[in-house]
Each structure stands twice: as C-alpha cells, then as structure tokens.
Amino acid sequence: ANLLEYLICLGFIDLGYSFCHASAFIRKGKTILCPGWRNVGKTNLLLSFLKDGAEFLSDDWVLIDSNGSLFSLPKRINLLHYNYRPNMDTIKKFDPILSVFSDTILQIIEGNKYKYTDLSGTQLKDSLKRRVHFEDLFKRDKVEKSENIDFIFFLNHDNAKDKVSINKCNIKNIKNRMIRILDYEQKPFKLAYDFYKFYTGKSSHLIDSARKINDNVLSEAFRDTSKVFQIDIPDQNQSELIKQHIIRIVGQ
C-alpha cells in the first residue's frame, strides 16, 4: 500500500497537484485543512465534525492544486481501535454487530482483561481495523472538490505539553512541515531510488524534481490563506477540545 501511495503521489505531482497527508472538511461553507501525522487524533477530530453535519473531503490523503482547490480522493476512512469509543453511536447506526464486537474488544483492552482471550493486545487492536466509505458510515454523499482553503490547522504531536494549545503560525513553516511529513513517509523509496541512480547512472527527472514541484504548488495554493494555526497536542485523545478551539476561531 505504501509503495502504491508513493507511485500515486508521483503521478499527481506530474499532473501539477500536491499530495498531502491531511484531513479536510467543509463546515458551514468554510473549508478547513488539518495536516498532521500520527497520534494527533486527526480522524477522531474529523468524525466529530462530520457528526455535526460537516461535509467530508478527506480522512488521510488530499489533493491540492495551485489555485488552492482541494480534491477528495476515493479512499475510505481508516478506523483504528481508538476511533471506536468516541464514535460508538455512529458505528452502531452503521453496523450494530460491529458496535457490539468492538465494545467487547475495547472492554478487554481497557480493563486489561487479557486472561479471557488467547490474543495479545496488539492482535485485539488489529481486529478492530476497518476501512469504511464515508457514504456508508454517514448515509450521505461526500463533496468531490472545494474551491478554496479558508483555514489551516496543523496538528502537532508534542509530548512535552500537558494540554492542548493553539497559536497562529507562519504559512511557510506549515508548508515546509507538510513536505517533510511526505519526505519521511517516502524515505525508503527515495533511498532505493538513490541506490538505483548510483549503481546504474540512470535518473528520473520527475523523482528528482518532485519535491520542488510540490513546494511550488503549495506556495501558490496557500498564497491567499492567512488564517493558519498550529495546534499542539499532548496525545491523540483530545479531539473534542481541539474541536472547541477550531470552532472558536472559525466561528459558530
């Protein structure tokens, strides 16, 4: 899957798009982009807004063009074990059997009752991994495109913090961090390419220029976006508090 995502990323960069690790949604006509990576509660935050009626654009990957338009990709919402408890009401409506199964598994995990099963904690958590279509989970259609980006909230995991904090941020800094996330995720493939180039003397103009193209697309896309913030998060269980901060800034 990671290799496929890398190839898809290169394909879209070749077409002039930026392929970004972020969730995105439209709330009351305002498009909100939430870049972030691992253990920041991105999916729980998204689901919380969707339950309130926000329009879905992306859970994980989003396309951005140089005009600042966001495009939804046909990728399902990825549910992990920590997404179930805060969203059990939604999951129950989607699949009552899954809600009963997940509640039982979570009780074992949360109560440290592993003696009642032969499975390890990791195996129990893995048993709750599901990819579901937004349309199936919420019984409504998603939007395919947003014409602009009104707000950017970069979700930053900071173990040194003991509470959620939010501050205005420089757009150039956010753009660079978004690109670094992609660099990190694609590091194994870029390393393999470097070895290939070294031993064969052959190179790919697209791979060599992909980072620069990505930088240029994001610079153009964000040129009119001034409402940019960083939210520092101590752990991934703060989605409701993060939501309150975002609503305070975006407006009721």
Residue ranges and their predicted role:
Residues 45-46:
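Post-Walker A alpha-helix
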Residues 39:
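Gly/Ser/Thr-rich loops at beta-strand to alpha-helix junctions
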Residues 42:
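Conserved lysine of the Walker
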Residues 1-31:
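Extreme N-terminal, non-catalytic leader segments
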Residues 21-36, 51-252:
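Glycine-rich, often acidic-flanked micro-motifs
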